[in-house]
Every structure is written in C-alpha cells, then in structure tokens.
Amino acid sequence: MKGKLLVIGFGPGSFEHITQRAREAIQESDMIIGYKTYVELIQGLLTNQQIISTGMTEEVSRAQEAVKQAEAGKTVAVISSGDAGVYGMAGLVYEVLIEKGWKKETGVELEVIPGISAINSCASLLGAPVMHDACTISLSDHLTPWELIEKRIEAAAQADFVVAFYNPKSGRRTRQIVEAQRILLKYRSPDTPVGLVKSAYRDREEVVMTNLKDMLNHEIGMLTTVVVGNSSTFFYDDLMITPRGYQRKYTLNQTEQPLRPHQRLRKEAEPWALDQEEAVKQSASAIEAVQNTREETAASRALAEEALQAILGESTSAVVHQPIESIFEVAVSPGLANKKFTPVQMTTLAEVVGEKGTMEYTPDHQIKLQIPTAHPDMIIEKLQAASFLLSPVGDVFTIKACDFCDGEKSDAIPHTEELQKRLGGMDMPKELKLGINGCGMACYGAVQEDIGIVYRKGAFDLFLGAKTVGRNAHSGQIVAEGIAPDDIVEIVENIIHEYKEKGHPNERFHKFFKRVKNVYGFDYQDITPKIKVEPAPCGD
C-alpha cells in the first residue's frame, strides 16, 4: 500500500490564518513531522497522530524520515510555518524523493498545501510595503553559502527591490544582518523605511517601524522578519507604504483623483509621493541647457570621486534614487465651437510634447497630451499663448459642442460658453459628457452623450441618460422640450451638481439616472433596447 506525503504550510501560526485544506490535511494524516515549535503551534488541531519533532537545523533528517514513513504506507504531514514552498520543507522532500528515484506516477503520492508566507503576513501588519517588485532573502547560511547570500543582497539593493529578510539572526548567527545592513546602505538612503515583525499573528507579536540606519538598535531574532523598503517607500500614520509604480500622472486642476478599479495606481492616488518627486528632462531648450550643465557637473564629480577611490584603494557605490517620473496630462482644443487648428498651434504642440511625450486625438474633439515634466506651468503658459482651450482629463465634466455650422448658427454659443465657465473640468464620480448641438439636425450627436441639449426653434430640448458604449448603446431619454434659453444653463447646472453629490464612485450617469429614478424633477424611463446582450468585460 502506497502512503502519502502532505507538505503543509500553516501560515503565521494563528488558527484564523490556517487554510481549510491545511486543517483537513492535518486531520487526515497518521503522522506529523516538524520542528518542535511548529508542532506546538498546531497542537489544537491534533487528535491521535503520531508526532516526530526535531530541532531547528534538522530539516534534512525530517524530510528523510517523512519519505521513509510514507513509503511504509502512512499518510505523513510535514509541516512548515508560512508557505511550505517558501523556505519550507517542500523542496527538501522533493530532493529526498528524487535521490531515491521517485516518479510521480508510481511513487508515493505528494501534495504541497500552500500557506500564507511571512512576507505576506508581515506586510499586512506593516501596511502595504510590498506593492511593487520585491524579493525574499534568507540570511541563514545553514544550507546556502554566505558568499552567495551576499551577492543576492547586493543585486537586490542595486535593483531597488523591496527586500524581506527571513531568518535574520539566531543565538549563534549574528553578523549576517549586520552585513546585510552594510550592503544596503551602499545603495539606499539611511532613512529608508524598515519594518520589523516578530511572531506575526501569534501571542508575542511585535511590530516596529524604524529605518535602515537604526534597525540594528532594535531586537531582531530568529522569529523576526525584516522588511526593507525601496526608494519610494514611506511611512504614514504608523504604516509602511510602497507606491505601485514609479510613474505618476496629474492633470490641470487636481492633486488627487478617484482611482478607477481597472487602472493601475496613478499619481492622483499617491499624494504621499510628492516629496520624492525628481525632475525629468524637459522638452524646452532652456530646460535642456540647465539639465546638460547639471549632467556635466555630475560627470566631473564622478570622475573626481573615481580618482579618489583609486588612490585610497576603496570602492563605494552611489545611493540608488529611483526617479519617480511625473506625467502631466491635459486635453487641448481650439475652442468649444471652433474645430480648426492653426499652424502655430500645431507647431506649439510639437514643441511642448517633445520626443518623450504623446499626443492622442480623442472622440471629444480634443487632443490629449501626456508630457513628462516637473514644470507644468511652463507648458500651460505656452499652450495658452497659442490660444488653446485647456481641460483636465479623467473623471471630469467635458462639453462636446458642435461647430454651429462654422458659427453661422450661433444662438446657442453663449450658453455653451457659460456652461464651460461654470462647470468645465469639474470633478465627477465618472467622466461626464455634455453634448450641445446648435440645430435640430443634431449632426454632432448630442443626444448620444450622457446629457444632451439641442437648440431648436429658439429653445432647447433636453436629453438625459444616453448609454454611450456597448452593443446595447442608446440615445438619451428626451425629458423636456422647448426650455427657454434663459433657463437652460441653470437646469443643466443643477442636474450636474446633483449627480456630483449623489453619484457613486465610478457610476456612469445613465446608471445613476436609472438608480435614483428622478434627477432635478425629471423622471427616469427605461428606453433600453429589449434585446439580450452579453455584458461588456469592462463592466460598462
């Protein structure tokens, strides 16, 4: 009869964090093999299993005994804290089996049961320090040569990884964490945030927030996990946070913007990272000249330092400061009614965007610019000097007006400009488009926008709740006809303010109208086409 090996990771040690499959595997086993402290941690889950517990450095003998017992027909649970496949017993058990010529099809059955690793459990107590690329390094040289561990620390420090050190120190092994700190300080600021977590989610749990230069002033032991941040990690209200990326985007009138669920974390949701902003190269020639001067100065200093190092016979490494690239986003157009770009405007766009920026024409009669810069004011000044209308991008209010037949049907233009003056660029729960057409032809499709107004026979017709995307898209519901020109601006303004106040984050206007049933006195009617259409993957 073939036995079975259950290699179990039981997480940080608290019952609440042990997975259901791990509990079941412990219950179905005949024998438990593990480090004696780990056996004690799961004592409450044991029934009548035979127990074999050994010391800290006896991993190989535990793996060998487990294989032996499984080959004798027993169901054997080999336990590890955290995840069995991360510095746990899974690899050693496989190695022992491979040495014995084990084959998956014919040998004893083996199941590896995952658990919550220390990097994850400790990160949850610290805040969110592992939100970007990270690595784990064990400082135990029991099974790995210290020279190899040193190389890995050096590489991780240079590459600006968040680093989680496992097994940082023991009673007899004390110098490794000191050496790790020394290597990290070659590349990272002494003020780099560090989190020390001892016995996560256990009775003697301790969490300490410190920094790279002071971390050794605190107690660090075998049960401690040391989490070292990268160059963008910061502390906030006793939390350790690493932003999701090194690129941030911002637009005209917002320092913070609501985060769309389907997008990566953007600068608008990273107000904490402002202090870490570093200038990037600019497109403008004057800025380039200043940058070149700085580069020449830096190069001269580097040569001098290199010569000094050669004389002293020393080698030093520069601290890594990963630049956080700031991307300025803005939408430009010749105007609300004017759809014609001048040669001067096109030349200005090419100049301010430069080689690293991008220009994207949008369906909103605008060109969206994305420009790497630390000086948006200079860009804004140049664009305004070229008579561009500038608008923020994102979840904001945008007017999409027709050209009013090249200005010949101009009666609705003053109302369009007044709405832009009052509401243009206002933050919204979700991007909101107001279509304005100057005659009953509505050839620019105002009725296909979230809100549409059409000037006809000296008055305005009002449309609400168009579904603008999807195969079941439809025009807005006509809720009023013949609105007096003197009233239209106030009516639209009140509708938009009601949506801004009561709309849920990321809720499109047509969904809002359907949910609340009445907006500023206008009742909702379901005019959705009665066809069965699969929902869009994006949820719209």
From Swiss-Prot:
GO terms for molecular function: 4 iron, 4 sulfur cluster binding; heme binding; metal ion binding; methyltransferase activity; oxidoreductase activity. Keywords: 4Fe-4S, Cobalamin biosynthesis, Iron, Iron-sulfur, Metal-binding, Methyltransferase, S-adenosyl-L-methionine, Transferase. Pfam families: NIR_SIR (PF01077), TP_methylase (PF00590). It is an enzyme of class 2 (transferase). Binds 1 [4Fe-4S] cluster. It catalyses: Co(II)-factor III + AH2 + S-adenosyl-L-methionine = Co-precorrin-4 + A + S-adenosyl-L-homocysteine. Its cofactor is [4Fe-4S] cluster. [4Fe-4S] cluster binds at residues 402, 405, 439, 443. Pathway: Cofactor biosynthesis; adenosylcobalamin biosynthesis. It comes from the Bacteria. Its EC number is 2.1.1.272. InterPro entries: 4pyrrol_Mease, 4pyrrol_Methylase_sf, 4pyrrole_Mease_sub1, 4pyrrole_Mease_sub2, Cbl_synth_CobJ/CibH_dom, NO2/SO3_Rdtase_4Fe4S_dom, NO2/SO3_Rdtase_4Fe4S_sf, NO2/SO3_Rdtase_FeS/sirohaem_BS. Changing residue 443 to A: No iron-sulfur cluster formed. Low activity with cobalt-factor III as substrate. Normal activity with Co-precorrin 3. One of its GO terms (biological process) is cobalamin biosynthetic process. PANTHER family: COBALT-FACTOR III C(17)-METHYLTRANSFERASE-RELATED. In the N-terminal section; belongs to the precorrin methyltransferase family. Is also able to convert cobalt-precorrin-3 to cobalt-precorrin-4. This is Cobalt-factor III methyltransferase. It comes from Priestia megaterium.
